Amino acid sequence: MAQFEWVHAAWLALAIVLEIIANVFLKFSDGFRRKIFGLLSLAAVLAAFSALSQAVKGIDLSVAYALWGGFGIAATLAAGWILFGQRLNRKGWIGLVLLLAGMIMVKLA
């Protein structure tokens, strides 16, 4: 692996934020009925993967992808709660805890 630098962590953080934005735009697109939000979602996904590609220059792919996916899911869940009133049931909370535990395990491996 290449030497870790904070710039790679910044790229990863940007990739996570862009993924969340893409998911919110996807919800706003209403199944691509509102095309502008659908196109914005696609652009945000493209930008997220571009940022992730920069992050993996200094972070192991398995770690970067696990963190990107895990934090993206957790933050999208929070965005759904705040913006759309979506709530998790007990199984959903258990799944989120397991997801976070898995991210920690991958990072420590």
Swiss-Prot record:
A GO cellular-component term linked to this record: plasma membrane
UniProt function note: Catalyzes the excretion of spermidine.
Species for this entry: Escherichia coli O6:H1 (strain CFT073 / ATCC 700928 / UPEC)
SUPFAM superfamilies named among the record's database cross-references: Multidrug resistance efflux transporter EmrE
Cytoplasmic-facing ranges: 27-35, 85-87
Protein origin, superkingdom: Bacteria
Periplasmic domain ranges by topology: 1-5, 57-63, 109
GO molecular function: amino-acid betaine transmembrane transporter activity; antiporter activity; choline transmembrane transporter activity; spermidine transmembrane transporter activity
Membrane-spanning ranges: 6-26, 36-56, 64-84, 88-108
Coiled-coil annotated residue ranges, if any: none
Complexes and interactors: Forms a complex with MdtJ.
Protein name: Spermidine export protein MdtI
Membrane topology: Multi-pass membrane protein
Family per record: Belongs to the drug/metabolite transporter (DMT) superfamily. Small multidrug resistance (SMR) (TC 2.A.7.1) family. MdtI subfamily.
Gene3D superfamilies: 1.10.3730.20
Keywords assigned: Cell inner membrane, Cell membrane, Membrane, Transmembrane, Transmembrane helix, Transport
Pfam (any one): Multi_Drug_Res
Cellular localisation: Cell inner membrane
Gene Ontology BP term (one): glycine betaine transport
